[in-house]
Amino acid sequence: MKLAVTLTLVTLALCCSSASAEICPSFQRVIETLLMDTPSSYEAAMELFSPDQDMREAGAQLKKLVDTLPQKPRESIIKLMEKIAQSSLCN
């Protein structure tokens, strides 16, 4: 769980850099599928970025880890992402 939360927070920090006023919709979809959808949906969302085999395997391992989290914390992480993206710190 700590790994998934850490990854999410690092991702949010990268998305909210001063050089980026908005989150790439495709990247946001990857994160949402990571947290809420099936492994096959997550893999399909990642394919847009042409990951190599090591990246695919790492993503699959991460998805398995995230899927062990209860539903409520995953929903809370999505809400946190939305809140951070809408924050004045990201604009």
Swiss-Prot record:
Gene3D superfamilies: Secretoglobin. PROSITE patterns: SCGB (PS51311). Its main location: secreted. Belongs to the secretoglobin family. GO terms for molecular function: phospholipase A2 inhibitor activity; polychlorinated biphenyl binding. Antiparallel homodimer; disulfide-linked. Interaction with LMBR1L has been observed in PubMed:16423471, but not in PubMed:23964685. Keywords: Disulfide bond, Phospholipase A2 inhibitor, Secreted, Signal. Pfam families: Uteroglobin (PF01099). SMART domains: UTG. Club cells (nonciliated cells of the surface epithelium of the pulmonary airways). Binds phosphatidylcholine, phosphatidylinositol, polychlorinated biphenyls (PCB) and weakly progesterone, potent inhibitor of phospholipase A2. Residues 1-21 form the signal peptide. GO terms for biological process: embryo implantation; female pregnancy; negative regulation of interleukin-13 production; negative regulation of interleukin-4 production; negative regulation of interleukin-5 production; negative regulation of T cell proliferation; negative regulation of transcription by RNA polymerase II; negative regulation of type II interferon production. GO terms for cellular component: cytoplasm; extracellular exosome; extracellular space; nuclear envelope; secretory granule. This is Uteroglobin. It is found in: Secreted.
